[in-house]
Amino acid sequence: IAAGKDSDVTQVSLDTIESTTHRALVRHGCRDDIAVHVANAVRVAESNGNRICGLYYLESYCRQLETGRIDGDVDPVVSVDRPGTVRVDGRLGFAQSAFAAAFPHAVASARANGICGLSVEHTHTCTSLGYFTEQFAREGLLGIGATNATPRVAPPGGSRAVLGTNPFAMAVPDGE
């Protein structure tokens, strides 16, 4: 969905948003299978009205693919070093594809051990942290996420920025 001049609003379908995002990422050097995950995250953000984590980010993604700040052709490395923990090294690629590589391992670990800590490392911004925790909830699991980011926000009652703009997210299964 994009606002036009004089308050006219042009409706764009979520399918169009997702396919356009995918094409733009691939055109700027992202591998097809990686672009699928990022385009889906943009679609979900837009469907939730979270425009700042949706199409707003597409230009930045494309620019950073071109400059090499994001590696759009990298395979994340998943490690399961001990029960209840999963790590994925995104190797300076997209957080969405790193998460997708580790997610099945984290779900299996949580089911086998009753809990799992998943660490997604060395990736570009994850944008909406809720995108990731909601995937755990859809699997019937409680998802709690946290990120490290440049401090931009003071906590309630605080006067100094100590949190990033997307520090925490939680998703709970709805029973369906």
Q: Residue locations for each model-derived region?
A:
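A glycine- and small-aliphatic-rich helix-loop capping segment at beta-alpha/alpha-beta transitions
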Residues: T67-R69, T133-G143, S159-N166
